[in-house]
A protein has these predicted regions:
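Outer-membrane beta-barrel domain signature
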Residues: 44-48, 108-112, 157-162, 185-189
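Intrinsic-disorder/low-complexity loop/linker signature
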Residues: 66, 153-155, 179
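Outer-membrane beta-barrel "beta-signal"
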Residues: 173-182, 193-199
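C-terminal outer-membrane beta-barrel translocator/porin domains of Gram-negative envelope proteins
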Residues: 2-130, 135-137, 142, 147
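Conserved active-site loop/cleft motifs that coordinate metal ions or position small ligands
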Residues: 134-138, 172-174, 181-188
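Short glycine-rich, acidic/polar surface loops and turns
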Residues: 122-123, 158-161, 166-173
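Surface-exposed coil/turn segments at beta-strand junctions on protein surfaces, enriched
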Residues: 114, 128-130, 164, 175, ...
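C-terminal/domain-terminus segments
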Residues: 134-152, 189-199
Length: 199
Protein backbone atom coordinates (compact mmCIF):
# COMPACT_ATOMS: atom_id res chain seq x y z
CA UNK A 1 0.00 0.00 0.00
CA UNK A 2 1.25 3.45 -0.95
CA UNK A 3 -0.15 6.71 0.37
CA UNK A 4 0.53 10.42 0.05
CA UNK A 5 -1.14 12.89 2.42
CA UNK A 6 -0.96 16.67 2.72
CA UNK A 7 -2.95 18.13 5.60
CA UNK A 8 -3.22 21.71 6.88
CA UNK A 9 -6.74 21.45 8.36
CA UNK A 10 -7.30 23.20 11.68
CA UNK A 11 -9.05 20.19 13.26
CA UNK A 12 -9.06 16.40 12.96
CA UNK A 13 -12.86 16.41 12.88
CA UNK A 14 -15.24 19.07 11.55
CA UNK A 15 -12.51 21.36 10.24
CA UNK A 16 -13.35 24.89 9.15
CA UNK A 17 -10.10 26.03 7.52
CA UNK A 18 -7.08 24.63 5.73
CA UNK A 19 -6.65 22.02 3.02
CA UNK A 20 -6.44 18.25 2.81
CA UNK A 21 -5.32 15.96 0.00
CA UNK A 22 -4.78 12.22 0.11
CA UNK A 23 -4.02 9.58 -2.51
CA UNK A 24 -3.92 5.88 -1.61
CA UNK A 25 -2.96 3.03 -3.91
CA UNK A 26 -3.52 -0.50 -2.59
CA UNK A 27 -2.95 -3.94 -4.04
CA UNK A 28 -5.08 -6.60 -2.36
CA UNK A 29 -4.57 -10.33 -2.73
CA UNK A 30 -6.43 -13.01 -0.79
CA UNK A 31 -8.48 -16.16 -0.83
CA UNK A 32 -12.23 -16.38 -0.36
CA UNK A 33 -13.74 -19.42 1.33
CA UNK A 34 -17.54 -19.43 1.39
CA UNK A 35 -19.66 -21.98 3.25
CA UNK A 36 -23.33 -21.79 2.13
CA UNK A 37 -25.86 -21.03 4.84
CA UNK A 38 -29.47 -22.16 5.18
CA UNK A 39 -30.80 -19.40 2.90
CA UNK A 40 -28.05 -19.58 0.28
CA UNK A 41 -28.83 -20.31 -3.36
CA UNK A 42 -25.38 -21.95 -3.57
CA UNK A 43 -25.09 -25.60 -2.48
CA UNK A 44 -21.34 -26.11 -2.52
CA UNK A 45 -18.44 -24.59 -0.61
CA UNK A 46 -16.63 -22.07 -2.80
CA UNK A 47 -12.90 -21.40 -2.75
CA UNK A 48 -11.68 -18.57 -4.95
CA UNK A 49 -8.56 -16.42 -5.19
CA UNK A 50 -8.97 -12.67 -5.50
CA UNK A 51 -6.63 -9.83 -6.35
CA UNK A 52 -7.39 -6.24 -7.19
CA UNK A 53 -6.01 -2.73 -7.34
CA UNK A 54 -7.64 0.15 -5.50
CA UNK A 55 -7.00 3.87 -5.97
CA UNK A 56 -8.61 6.37 -3.60
CA UNK A 57 -8.46 10.15 -3.94
CA UNK A 58 -9.80 12.68 -1.45
CA UNK A 59 -9.54 16.47 -1.33
CA UNK A 60 -11.05 19.00 1.07
CA UNK A 61 -10.41 22.72 0.71
CA UNK A 62 -11.60 25.85 2.46
CA UNK A 63 -10.73 28.60 -0.07
CA UNK A 64 -11.08 31.53 2.33
CA UNK A 65 -8.56 31.19 5.14
CA UNK A 66 -9.41 34.35 7.08
CA UNK A 67 -11.35 33.94 10.30
CA UNK A 68 -14.94 34.87 9.69
CA UNK A 69 -18.45 34.01 10.84
CA UNK A 70 -19.35 32.17 7.63
CA UNK A 71 -17.03 29.80 5.80
CA UNK A 72 -17.45 27.09 3.22
CA UNK A 73 -15.46 24.17 1.94
CA UNK A 74 -15.37 21.93 -1.10
CA UNK A 75 -15.02 18.18 -0.61
CA UNK A 76 -14.25 15.53 -3.24
CA UNK A 77 -13.76 11.79 -2.88
CA UNK A 78 -13.35 9.09 -5.51
CA UNK A 79 -12.59 5.36 -5.52
CA UNK A 80 -11.45 3.35 -8.54
CA UNK A 81 -11.37 -0.34 -7.72
CA UNK A 82 -10.87 -3.45 -9.90
CA UNK A 83 -12.30 -5.80 -7.28
CA UNK A 84 -13.77 -9.06 -8.57
CA UNK A 85 -17.09 -10.46 -7.35
CA UNK A 86 -17.31 -12.75 -4.34
CA UNK A 87 -19.50 -15.85 -4.11
CA UNK A 88 -22.60 -14.00 -2.93
CA UNK A 89 -24.05 -10.53 -2.76
CA UNK A 90 -23.47 -9.88 0.94
CA UNK A 91 -19.82 -10.96 0.84
CA UNK A 92 -19.24 -8.81 -2.23
CA UNK A 93 -20.86 -5.77 -0.60
CA UNK A 94 -18.91 -6.17 2.65
CA UNK A 95 -15.64 -6.14 0.72
CA UNK A 96 -16.52 -3.00 -1.25
CA UNK A 97 -15.37 0.44 -0.10
CA UNK A 98 -18.16 2.36 1.57
CA UNK A 99 -18.88 6.05 1.26
CA UNK A 100 -17.93 7.91 4.44
CA UNK A 101 -18.05 11.63 3.64
CA UNK A 102 -20.54 12.04 6.50
CA UNK A 103 -19.38 10.85 9.95
CA UNK A 104 -22.39 8.64 10.62
CA UNK A 105 -22.07 6.68 7.37
CA UNK A 106 -19.40 4.59 9.10
CA UNK A 107 -22.00 3.36 11.60
CA UNK A 108 -24.48 2.08 8.99
CA UNK A 109 -24.28 -0.72 6.44
CA UNK A 110 -26.10 0.79 3.46
CA UNK A 111 -25.53 -1.18 0.22
CA UNK A 112 -26.69 1.78 -1.90
CA UNK A 113 -23.66 3.78 -0.69
CA UNK A 114 -21.10 1.06 -1.43
CA UNK A 115 -19.58 0.83 -4.89
CA UNK A 116 -16.58 -0.59 -6.71
CA UNK A 117 -16.03 2.76 -8.38
CA UNK A 118 -17.62 6.06 -7.44
CA UNK A 119 -17.24 9.82 -7.41
CA UNK A 120 -18.65 11.97 -4.62
CA UNK A 121 -18.51 15.75 -4.42
CA UNK A 122 -20.09 18.28 -2.14
CA UNK A 123 -19.89 21.41 -0.08
CA UNK A 124 -19.65 22.26 3.61
CA UNK A 125 -21.27 25.48 4.82
CA UNK A 126 -20.14 26.57 8.28
CA UNK A 127 -21.53 29.36 10.45
CA UNK A 128 -19.63 30.13 13.68
CA UNK A 129 -21.78 32.51 15.76
CA UNK A 130 -19.69 31.97 18.92
CA UNK A 131 -16.21 30.75 19.73
CA UNK A 132 -16.10 26.93 19.62
CA UNK A 133 -19.68 26.73 18.31
CA UNK A 134 -20.36 25.75 14.69
CA UNK A 135 -23.55 25.31 12.72
CA UNK A 136 -22.78 23.13 9.71
CA UNK A 137 -24.58 21.96 6.61
CA UNK A 138 -22.89 19.26 4.52
CA UNK A 139 -24.45 18.35 1.17
CA UNK A 140 -23.14 15.84 -1.38
CA UNK A 141 -23.85 14.22 -4.69
CA UNK A 142 -22.94 10.51 -4.93
CA UNK A 143 -22.31 9.02 -8.37
CA UNK A 144 -21.62 5.25 -8.42
CA UNK A 145 -19.90 4.25 -11.66
CA UNK A 146 -20.03 0.50 -11.01
CA UNK A 147 -22.52 -0.78 -8.43
CA UNK A 148 -23.96 -4.17 -7.51
CA UNK A 149 -27.69 -4.79 -7.29
CA UNK A 150 -29.52 -7.75 -5.79
CA UNK A 151 -32.05 -9.47 -8.05
CA UNK A 152 -35.35 -10.86 -6.69
CA UNK A 153 -34.13 -14.45 -7.22
CA UNK A 154 -31.09 -13.93 -4.98
CA UNK A 155 -28.55 -13.50 -7.75
CA UNK A 156 -26.72 -10.22 -8.23
CA UNK A 157 -25.47 -8.19 -11.15
CA UNK A 158 -24.09 -4.77 -12.06
CA UNK A 159 -26.40 -1.79 -12.33
CA UNK A 160 -26.16 0.67 -15.20
CA UNK A 161 -23.48 3.35 -14.63
CA UNK A 162 -24.75 6.21 -12.43
CA UNK A 163 -28.08 4.40 -11.92
CA UNK A 164 -27.76 4.64 -8.14
CA UNK A 165 -26.84 8.33 -8.01
CA UNK A 166 -28.12 10.14 -4.99
CA UNK A 167 -27.89 13.26 -2.86
CA UNK A 168 -27.20 13.09 0.86
CA UNK A 169 -26.83 15.74 3.52
CA UNK A 170 -26.35 16.40 7.21
CA UNK A 171 -26.94 19.36 9.51
CA UNK A 172 -24.86 19.69 12.69
CA UNK A 173 -24.71 21.81 15.82
CA UNK A 174 -21.18 21.37 17.18
CA UNK A 175 -19.41 22.43 20.34
CA UNK A 176 -15.63 22.05 20.08
CA UNK A 177 -14.74 21.06 23.65
CA UNK A 178 -11.16 20.61 24.93
CA UNK A 179 -11.53 16.81 24.62
CA UNK A 180 -13.20 16.78 21.20
CA UNK A 181 -16.39 17.77 19.36
CA UNK A 182 -19.82 17.35 20.95
CA UNK A 183 -22.55 17.39 18.34
CA UNK A 184 -26.20 16.99 17.51
CA UNK A 185 -26.75 15.85 13.93
CA UNK A 186 -29.62 15.19 11.59
CA UNK A 187 -28.75 13.11 8.53
CA UNK A 188 -30.63 12.86 5.27
CA UNK A 189 -29.82 9.52 3.62
CA UNK A 190 -32.50 8.90 0.98
CA UNK A 191 -31.21 5.41 0.12
CA UNK A 192 -31.63 4.22 3.72
CA UNK A 193 -34.84 2.65 5.08
CA UNK A 194 -35.34 5.67 7.36
CA UNK A 195 -33.99 8.65 5.38
CA UNK A 196 -33.88 11.07 8.33
CA UNK A 197 -31.62 10.04 11.22
CA UNK A 198 -30.94 12.02 14.39
CA UNK A 199 -27.66 11.45 16.25
Amino acid sequence: RLAYTRNTLNRKQFASSGNFFECKVSYVRGKELTFPGSTSIIDDTISKNHKWLSIQLEALSFPFQKKQVVNWGLHFKSVLNSQSLFANYTASMLALPGLNVLPDLDTYFIPAYRSTQYVCAGTQLIVSPLKNIDLRLDAYGFFPIIQLILNPDGTFTYAKPLDGRSVLAAGHVIYHSPVGPVRATINYLPKYAQPFQFQ
